[in-house]
Structure formats: structure tokens, C-alpha cells
């Protein structure tokens, strides 16, 4: 039997039939797969690390990272916001704060008087204040003790309480509301022309020489009235106590009027012990005593007539500017007026005499500033 030679088997591999195009596609697929794996690892890595860290500390180390993580994140975000805001803040220059205006500060502005008897409640007080502000006013004068000696608030002094006016105002409300509306409230107090106070306490009054009777500035039948005695320490104390009361209620500025003697001089007048001090000297001492008592806590104004300012009078014994007055309110009589030039001359002369602040009231010219 004839034998045929054994045929050699041929092994065939699939790669033997790969074309170039197939190899290219395979390479691209592998590259895409690698990129996908790397991307997935990149995304998952933080979470895996957080999980691993949390597991390590909570399971292995028995610790809780939630609180510390929150604090860390808060600190980090705070630092980032601070760093972000610093360039903006540094690029804008800081505006210097304006100095605060105190109640005792004297500012330029218009003045007006307020009828205290109309300030019956909070609504009336606020309405009056807003009307003045709408008219451009800065200062509001409220007479709290008049020339009759009546006091328009609940004074705690014995003499003031004995001479309470029929209308009483709530000082704290008046002062606070006027300030809220942008006004400077000024308490006006009549000083030595005070018949009610003299009758309530004879120790404060001028008497007839050698008698216990109160001296009157005219015949009783003609309506004569007693006056407070500028030489009496009790009188100076009483006026000072009234200043203290209105200041405690919120009035930082006070206008004192009738800081003077009666116009008449008579040998029948008994002022007690004068130690040889004349009228001008005693008024200067009284003004200095109030200034020493209140210092910078209260701004004290003094009101005088034009005649008392420009010349000497029996009431003062010297021009008002020579009494140590720093803040002066001058009243021009209604029968005359001052033009701008005359006001300038008056201001200059009083400034040279030592007056620091001057307000002129000229009703005929509708000028009060």
C-alpha cells in the first residue's frame, strides 16, 4: 500500500489576518479605555480618600471628623473671603469720620422762640419741632422761668415748686424730641427779676433798709414788684439749681436773662453784706460762679439789650461785655434796627471786648442769628 507523505499542519492566528485599519482602531480603543479609567480614578480619588480617612479615624482611631472638618472649611472660606476683600478695601481710601457735634457745641444757624404752653403732649412737641426745622431753624428757645417767677416744669427746688406755672411741660420729652428733629433746645431762665421767688423766700430778696419788708421797684398801688438779691448766695444757688435741673432733663444750652439789678437805685435798698463790691463786680462774680459750677457741661448764654451792651447802665454798672460774658445774645429794640454794616461793627467791638459767640435779635429786620 502506497504511503503518502504526511502533510504539515498550518496554524492560523487571527492576527495574521489583521489589517492596518483594524490595528489602528484597536489602538484607539485602548487609548480611550485608558483615558476613561484615568478620568474615573481622578473623579473617585477624593471620595475614596475621604472615605478612607474617615474610616481610619472613626473606626481605627475612634474620632469624629465632622466638627473639625466644618471648622476647617469655615476657616478656609473665611480666609478666602478676607483675602478677596482686602484688595478692594485697600484700593478705596477710608473716609475719615466726621466729628460728633455735642449738645454744648455752638453752631451757626437761625434762632426762634417757642411758646411752651403749646407743648402739651408728644404730638404737639414733635409738630412744633418739625415746623421750626422746616423753616430752617437751628436753635429753639423755650422760656422755662419767666419774669413773673413762674416755673414751667416740675422743679424740685422749694422756691420753684412753690411758683409752678399753670402749664407744666415734660422737659425730658421736649429736649429729646427737639434733638431728634435736628434742633438745639435752649432753656431760657429769668434770673433776678423774680417777684414770685422773692415772695416765696425772703432770704433771696432785696429788702428795705432796716426793715423786713421786701423792697419794691414801684409803689405797691402802681404794681411794684420785689426782686431777687444778686448779692445773696442763696439767690445764686437757686438759679444754679434751676440750671442743673434743666440740664439733667437734656438741655445742654441755657439762656439767662435779667442777670442785672433793678433800674432804680435808692438808699432804701438793703442788699445785705456787699463787702464793698459794686454792681458790676457782683454780677461778674455771679456769672463766674455759674461758669465754675457747670464748666463745659452746659453752654451758658446771657441776654442783654443793645443799650446794655453798647454803654454803661445802672442795672449792670458796666457794659455787658465787661462782666465776663462769653456767649451773648443782644436784643435790638423794636423801635430801631441794625443793617449789615452796623451788625458787623457791633460784632467786631464785642469780639475785641472778649465775647466769643454773638447772636443778634433784630425783630424789625426779621434777623435772629
Describe the predicted segments one by one.
Residues 28-46:
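Hydrophobic membrane-insertion alpha-helices, especially the h-region
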Residues 1-27:
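N-terminal Lys/Arg-rich, disordered targeting/topogenic segments
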Residues 45-53, 320-369:
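Substrate-binding cleft of secreted/luminal carbohydrate-active enzymes
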Residues 102-113, 117, 192-244:
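Active-site-adjacent "subsite" loops/lids of carbohydrate-active enzymes
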Residues 50-107:
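N-terminal, intrinsically disordered, polar/charged segments of Gram-positive cell-envelope systems
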Residues 186-193, 254-258, 277-315, 354-364:
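Aromatic-lined carbohydrate-recognition surfaces of secreted/lumenal glycan-active proteins
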Residues 123-151, 245-257, 320-330:
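Catalytic domains of carbohydrate-active enzymes, especially glycoside hydrolases
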Residues 93, 146-190, 259, 264-298:
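Aromatic-lined substrate-binding rim segments of carbohydrate-active enzymes
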Amino acid at each position: 500500500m502506497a504511503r503518502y507523505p504526511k502533510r504539515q499542519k498550518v496554524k492560523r492566528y487571527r492576527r495574521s489576518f489583521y489589517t492596518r485599519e483594524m490595528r489602528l482602531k484597536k489602538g484607539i480603543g485602548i487609548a480611550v479605555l485608558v483615558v476613561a479609567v484615568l478620568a474615573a480614578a481622578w473623579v473617585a480619588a477624593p471620595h475614596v480618600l475621604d472615605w478612607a480617612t474617615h474610616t481610619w479615624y472613626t473606626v481605627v482611631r475612634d474620632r469624629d471628623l465632622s466638627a473639625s472638618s466644618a471648622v476647617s472649611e469655615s476657616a478656609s472660606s473665611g480666609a478666602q473671603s478676607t483675602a478677596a476683600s482686602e484688595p478692594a478695601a485697600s484700593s478705596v481710601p477710608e473716609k475719615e469720620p466726621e466729628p460728633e457735634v455735642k449738645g454744648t457745641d455752638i453752631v451757626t444757624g437761625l434762632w426762634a422762640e417757642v411758646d411752651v404752653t403749646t407743648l402739651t403732649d408728644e404730638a404737639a412737641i414733635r409738630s412744633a419741632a418739625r415746623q421750626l426745622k422746616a423753616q430752617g431753624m437751628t436753635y429753639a428757645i423755650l422760656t422755662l422761668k419767666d419774669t413773673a417767677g413762674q416755673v414751667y416744669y416740675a422743679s424740685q427746688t422749694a422756691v420753684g415748686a412753690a411758683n409752678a406755672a399753670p402749664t407744666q411741660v415734660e422737659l425730658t420729652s421736649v429736649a429729646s424730641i427737639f434733638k431728634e428733629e435736628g434742633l438745639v433746645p435752649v432753656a431760657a431762665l429769668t434770673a433776678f427779676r423774680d417777684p414770685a421767688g422773692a415772695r416765696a423766700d425772703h432770704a433771696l430778696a432785696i429788702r428795705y433798709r432796716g426793715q423786713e419788708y421786701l423792697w419794691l421797684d414801684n409803689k405797691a398801688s402802681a404794681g411794684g414788684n420785689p426782686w431777687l438779691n444778686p448779692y445773696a448766695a442763696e439767690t445764686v444757688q437757686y438759679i444754679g439749681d434751676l440750671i442743673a435741673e434743666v440740664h439733667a432733663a437734656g438741655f445742654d444750652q441755657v439762656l439767662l436773662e435779667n442777670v442785672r439789678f433793678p433800674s432804680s437805685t435808692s438808699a432804701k435798698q438793703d442788699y445785705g453784706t456787699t463787702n464793698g463790691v459794686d454792681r458790676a463786680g457782683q454780677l461778674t462774680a455771679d456769672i463766674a460762679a455759674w461758669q465754675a459750677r457747670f464748666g463745659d457741661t452746659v453752654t451758658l448764654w446771657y441776654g442783654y439789650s443793645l443799650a446794655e451792651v453798647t454803654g454803661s447802665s445802672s442795672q449792670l454798672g458796666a457794659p455787658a461785655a465787661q462782666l465776663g460774658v462769653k456767649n451773648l445774645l443782644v436784643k435790638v429794640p423794636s423801635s430801631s434796627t441794625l443793617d449789615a454794616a452796623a451788625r458787623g461793627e457791633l460784632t467786631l467791638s464785642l469780639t475785641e471786648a472778649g465775647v466769643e459767640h454773638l447772636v443778634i435779635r433784630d425783630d424789625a429786620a426779621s434777623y435772629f442769628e
